Amino acid sequence: SHDIRIPLVSATGSTRMGKAVGAAVGRRLGRSLLELGGNNAIIISAEADLDMALIGAAFGAVGTAGQRCTSTRRLIIQEKVYNKFKEKLVNAYKQLKIGDPLNIKNHVGPLIDKDAVKMYLEAIEKCKAEGGKFIVEGGVLKGKGFESGCYVQPCIAEAKNSYGIVQHDTFAPILYLMKYKTID
């Protein structure tokens, strides 16, 4: 971002990262294109193919342990299919295999470090404090294969889009479910 030979810096990530990139590029009067703090969503309509939506939602939320800037963090589900989809999603989460990411039988690997684990746990507590209801509980996994302390349980919370934590990027496998009546 400091190199004047680079005419445009494009980055996707947290608001914090964007401020750092923006400041560095701004010092050289360069241009930047930033996509920040979006907490990607999937909107599931009453007409959606729920099995297809389930595959996309589950992979988007837990792939790379939710540590991509493009990870799915919110599911906005039409109320007529909300309970049916929620049941399918909870069942899918019960079948997730967590462990060494080099083992192709595993779906979810570790968070990058203990700081990421701390932010994951803080996000869970913030969601609960704002009124979120966890339908799949999170937590740090213990036991054989999890000695690093960086393996966590992907979790699902019923939440409201107005919650502060829902508007804040958490690079971890936390998925927020929200119900809608009409798209408007």
Predicted regions and their residues:
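A structural signal for short secondary-structure junctions
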Residues: C69, D169-T170
